[in-house]
Amino acid sequence: MNLADKVLAVNNDLPIRTDSPVHSGKVRSVYWLTATDSKRLIEEKGYDVPSDTSLAIMVISDRISAFDCIWSGENDMRGVPGKGAALNAISNHWFKMFKEQGLADSHILDIPHPFVWIVQKAKPVMIEAICRQYITGSMWRSYTKGERDFCGIELPEGLAKDSKLTSLLQTPSTKGILEGIPGVPAVDDVNITRKNIEDNFEAFNFKSVDDIARYEKLLTEGFDVISTALSKIDQVFVDTKFEFGYVKDVNGDDKLIYMDEVGTPDSSRIWDGEQYRAGKVVENSKEGFRQLLLNHFPDADILLNKDRMSEREALARDNKLPLSVLMDVSKTYTDIAEKITGNKIVLSDNPKAEIIAILREQYQLID
């Protein structure tokens, strides 16, 4: 078996019993279980949710996306070995820590396999909850253009690239394209202010105005938990994106939870502490891959300019990256996962076959 066979590139074709279309995201696919299977698993496994809760199987892949495109490599390498398992392991670690420290629950009810979560259905808050401790990335690009108002926050003069901000800043954006919200352009992932959220809290799926403060508190507390833990392994938590949603608790009441993923190299910038103190930025996140792509192709504007999306998609489709590039990304992801969790990331020989066997034999979800 060659290395490409150990990569789970296609994750939306599993024979899981469902009566709904499979949702295929950039990295994860979601299989909504039938009402009968959801109720059965809640009873058999003792999940702490109402008996009529809708459950789903969420399967991560090893695909790598950047600049809204999926990238692949030579030798039919359609993903990054170990990436999916590393991302799930990191999220599992932080979600568990959040719960132990009394912050909030997540949507995860069970982990049958390193690539698989069983989750309860949540109503997502339509906000990309972004926190920044350092000025870099899109904030720095805006700053260099003379912009000093960022998501309604006034930035001081004299800031230096990659420097630490005086306080943790929350700089939210929309989750996808939201239409009909006054003052919020109907474009993907557009920056918004707290006032935008307050004035239109229902459009962002908040149950009440008070829940805005609750979400902000969970965002700050979650960031601080991860930042403190990363500092102990000499890593700098630079910025991150959280997602939140509502689920029903066992009493049928709404509760705000963390969802999607948290504190991973896909959703965060993580810098090596020793290198940062020496004046260098060494990425232990997907940002390193993004920078490589910007340097790899002659016309970086294709990757940054949303008006050139068709050219960008052709670039990703027609160019196979060197195998060494994907293996470097693999090492970045598995190394940081092992540092965070203290456990080795083991590559599955045939992840799809393993998942099918477990879901058939232990969960009776495959005929």
UniProtKB/Swiss-Prot annotation:
UniProt keyword list: ATP-binding, Ligase, Nucleotide-binding, Purine biosynthesis
EC numbers, comma separated: 6.3.2.6
InterPro entries reported for this sequence: SAICAR_synt/ADE2_N, SAICAR_synthase_Vibrio-typ
GO cellular component: cytoplasm
Keyword hit for Nucleotide-binding: yes
Keyword Ligase belongs to the record: yes
Pfam families hit by this protein: SAICAR_synt (PF01259)
Enzyme class per UniProt: ligase
Reaction equations catalysed: 5-amino-1-(5-phospho-D-ribosyl)imidazole-4-carboxylate + L-aspartate + ATP = (2S)-2-[5-amino-1-(5-phospho-beta-D-ribosyl)imidazole-4-carboxamido]succinate + ADP + phosphate + 2 H(+)
Top-level taxon: Bacteria
GO biological process: 'de novo' IMP biosynthetic process
Pathway linked to the protein: Purine metabolism; IMP biosynthesis via de novo pathway; 5-amino-1-(5-phospho-D-ribosyl)imidazole-4-carboxamide from 5-amino-1-(5-phospho-D-ribosyl)imidazole-4-carboxylate: step 1/2
Family: Belongs to the SAICAR synthetase family.
Record-given protein name: Phosphoribosylaminoimidazole-succinocarboxamide synthase
